[in-house]
Amino acid sequence: MVPENTLHALEHTVENNFTHFETDLRMTKDGEIILNHDATIDRTTHEKGNISELNWKDLKKINAGSKFYERKDLNRKTSFVLLKEALSIFDKLCFNLDLKESGMAEKVYKIIKETNAEDRTLVSSFSPSRLDEFIELSNGEILTSGSFRENVIARYLPTKNRNFRIQALQAPFIYRGLKVHSRKLKEFCEINNLYLHIWTVNNDEDFDKCLEFGCDGIMTDEPLKLRKYLERNS
């Protein structure tokens, strides 16, 4: 495939006519919001350092996919991407944005507003406090998705209407060996008027299970494989 959360990944998404892109957000030392999963650049590049301790002017010079390209024996470069660039350049894509750190909610909200991306973004976070902060700032103007807190409630209070302020629930297919996906989880979402998105699902057998209990969205590292599966089973 392509190196995650990079310009190459965005280009690949558009070239293959996909409409949605899930990514994670980190903040640089100088306050820029970039697309990246990890707190450091160690795993994906041949450089080292915490993103929170690096300025954007230095990060943008780094080959963001160097380790991926090395594994694939490819002589290629790609770059990290600012959130504001992703939303403005790829203005037909819908984005699922995961707030990975505290202190970025206001910046993310302003960027979404400035790029007129309110109707094509969904903001999520594993941290209830980060998500609550964003919901307060956006006042429901931008779609949000719950995760850990809402999954716990769904597990132990499955028949209750909880009057959530979110519009979707994102749940893992399996978490630490525990099966999370289920028809009961879908029923909980229906009771609470929530869309259900399941992550991370990468093979046909698990695609089958997701569709059997009626999830509304599948997050995958293998979008081409998922597309072929859907074409075969449409």
Residue ranges and their predicted role:
Residues 1-234:
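Phosphate-group recognition and catalysis centered on beta-loop-alpha active-site segments
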